[in-house]
């Protein structure tokens, strides 16, 4: 989903192997090993991969195709010294290791690892000796490398305490549901420190991504499984490559699930040795993109004077140079969601409330209330102040002229504030230090977004609406707090105004009449219904941005200004809309009505 400025690099510490597989009444000899599957999957997903492991000389024919795709570094060994595994897959889903020969795996040395530099990514496979894996993970992490690790059930049973230390040393930890149960007790108890991520693969049930304490479930494509070997490692390599490229972990996991599903339809790593691009994440075909309409709307935005980036200055915003500016925007943007009222399972009206003698709507109200908050108690907007904020205190700071907090999402707001503050404190970050860390990267925007993927109030949304909005604000303010690297731009900022515009313009088309009827009736939708619309709108806006050639900040401001031209409660003012000649005028459609803290 992200735009690559260069191919990400992944180091894989772990040896390929030569295996004997038993499945569905068949016995097959195959190239294998976690290092091989992980490396090939990452390479196919766009990464440059270096595998660190003893290298056989001569190269066995079974490994020759993989060797051509990977940068395999390590001391020479005879082929018979490679690890060997004999694995049986039982009809009930269990895996039995009949034989495991460690071979040269124990000969991997840290000195063989090339200098990757801070910010690089590495994966340490689940070595037969978890202490060896732990040593690699710790040393790589100390060198500033983003480290992923995996495990295997027998290793957890025999060395649970060591594997838990591996979890602590990992930025990204991969396991299956059985292993998660052995480590944490159950899937629902999986938790790690802020800034850490656990991926739990669940076979046909998909995967769970846990960002610190926040779980996000991912569906898996349905396929006819032939050989399950390497599914978890394929997932791992794809996910790490996509995270290194800039994707949110949950979006990376969707692509990883699609690649893992394809891998199990063949024997061994065959699906990873093709030149075709990796499979796309499944799309809900109830909502489709209209390519012709997208092209026409992109043409309008390319030349429309209304498509200009907003600088986020004015009466509701801090003056340039105000010392509270960063805290105002970091804490305030996390609260930019849910400005609408519901009654009897349907959308009732947008939120409008009096403040300073003026009736202000939704986002405008929030910014004005936060401006007052910054004047009254600026220390409360710092991470430390947000972390300890009580519900009553939040209500008092957001009070309208009648003395009440009018925000319709209720307790979601103070909970969001505390999540933001607590994660920032746990990570040792302030808004200024987070920006400094991003600025030190050769891809500042990508690093900025990945840091927010660790912070409450932002991390929960795979589509990064609030993260992208904050990036746009900080780059467009007069202070230019955030710079972008070459070819970097913010991802689509898809809120409910944007979705309403996309539906009515016709850049996305609802092919399912039942869903279209629910949208038109403004009914509260299920999560699956909402996701179908929002994901399609995200893709449509990304394509409008690509075709139109305008910065995403300008594209976003065009869509946001459409909230007045094509509003929620009154007839659209089509003559005032620059996109009117390209519009499908599907004005009966309405944005997904779905209560979320994402937008």
Describe the role of every protein-language-model region.
Residues 4-7, 190-279:
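Conserved phosphate-binding/catalytic region of the ribokinase-like
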Residues 7-9, 18-29, 44-124, 138-146:
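Conserved N-terminal subdomain of the carbohydrate kinase-like
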Residues 14-16, 34, 234:
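Active-site metal-binding loops of divalent metal-dependent hydrolases
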Residues 39-48, 242-245:
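Alpha-helix C-terminal capping segments
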Residues 40, 85-88, 206-210:
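Short beta-strand scaffold segments in enzyme catalytic cores
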Residues 116-117, 167, 192:
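A short, aliphatic-rich alpha-helical micro-motif
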Residues 122-189, 204-207:
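Conserved beta-alpha-beta core of the PfkB/ribokinase-like small-molecule kinase fold
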Residues 280-599:
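HhH-family (HhH-GPD) DNA N-glycosylase catalytic core used in base-excision repair
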């Amino acid at each position: 989903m992200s735009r690559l400025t260069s191919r990400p690099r992944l180091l894989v510490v772990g040896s390929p192997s030569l295996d004997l597989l038993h499945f569905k009444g068949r016995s097959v000899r195959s190239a294998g090993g976690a290092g091989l599957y992980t490396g090939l999957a990452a390479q196919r997903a766009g990464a440059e991969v270096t595998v660190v492991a003893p290298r056989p000389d001569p190269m066995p024919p079974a490994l020759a195709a993989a060797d051509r795709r990977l940068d395999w570094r390590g001391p020479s060994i005879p082929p018979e010294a490679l690890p060997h595994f004999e694995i049986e897959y039982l009809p009930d889903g269990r895996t039995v290791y009949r034989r495991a020969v460690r071979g040269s795996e124990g000969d991997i040395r840290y000195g063989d690892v090339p200098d990757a530099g801070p910010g690089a990514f590495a994966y340490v496979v689940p070595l037969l000796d978890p202490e060896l894996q732990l040593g690699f993970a710790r040393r790589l992490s100390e060198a500033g490398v983003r480290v992923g690790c995996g495990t295997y059930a027998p290793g957890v049973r025999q060395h649970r305490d060591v594997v838990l230390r591996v979890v602590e040393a990992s930025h990204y930890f991969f396991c299956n549901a059985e292993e998660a149960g052995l480590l944490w007790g159950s899937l629902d108890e999986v938790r790690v420190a802020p800034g850490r991520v656990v991926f739990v693969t669940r076979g046909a049930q998909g995967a769970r991504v846990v960002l610190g304490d926040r779980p996000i479930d991912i569906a898996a494509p349905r396929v006819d499984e032939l050989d399950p070997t390497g599914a978890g490692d394929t997932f791992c390599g794809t996910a790490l490559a996509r995270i290194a490229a800039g994707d949110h972990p949950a979006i990376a996991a969707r692509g990883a699930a699609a690649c893992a599903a394809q891998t199990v339809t063949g024997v061994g790593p065959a699906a990873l040795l093709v030149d075709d691009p990796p499979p796309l994440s499944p799309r809900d075909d109830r909502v489709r993109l209209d390519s012709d309409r997208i092209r026409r709307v992109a043409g309008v935005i390319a030349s429309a004077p209304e498509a200009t980036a907003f600088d986020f200055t004015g009466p509701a915003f801090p003056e340039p140079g105000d010392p509270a500016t960063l805290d105002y925007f970091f804490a305030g943007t996390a609260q930019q969601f849910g400005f609408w009222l519901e009654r009897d399972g349907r959308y009732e009206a947008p939120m409008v409330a009096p403040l300073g003698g003026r009736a202000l709507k939704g986002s405008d109200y929030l910014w004005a209330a936060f401006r007052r908050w910054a004047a009254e108690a600026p220390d409360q907007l710092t991470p430390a102040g947000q972390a300890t904020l009580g519900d009553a205190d939040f209500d008092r700071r957001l009070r309208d002229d009648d003395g009440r907090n009018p925000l319709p999402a209720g307790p979601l707001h103070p909970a969001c504030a505390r999540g933001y503050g607590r994660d920032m404190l746990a990570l040792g970050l302030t808004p200024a230090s987070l920006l400094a860390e991003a600025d030190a990267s050769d891809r500042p925007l990508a690093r900025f977004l990945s840091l927010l993927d660790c912070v409450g109030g932002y991390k929960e949304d795979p589509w990064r609406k609030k993260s992208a909005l904050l990036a746009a604000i900080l780059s467009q303010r007069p202070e230019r707090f955030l710079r972008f690297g070459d070819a970097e731009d913010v991802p689509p900022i898809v809120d409910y105004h944007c979705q309403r515009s996309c539906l009515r313009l016709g850049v996305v088309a609802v092919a399912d009449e039942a869903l279209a009827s629910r949208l038109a009736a403004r009914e509260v939708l299920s999560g699956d219904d909402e996701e179908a619309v929002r994901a399609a709108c995200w893709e449509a806006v990304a394509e409008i941005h690509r075709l139109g050639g305008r910065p995403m900040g300008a594209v976003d401001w065009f869509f946001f200004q459409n909230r007045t031209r094509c509003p929620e409660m009154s007839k659209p003012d089509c003559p005032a809309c620059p996109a009117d000649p390209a519009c499908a005028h599907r004005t009966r459609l309405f944005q997904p009505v779905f209560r979320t803290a994402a937008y």
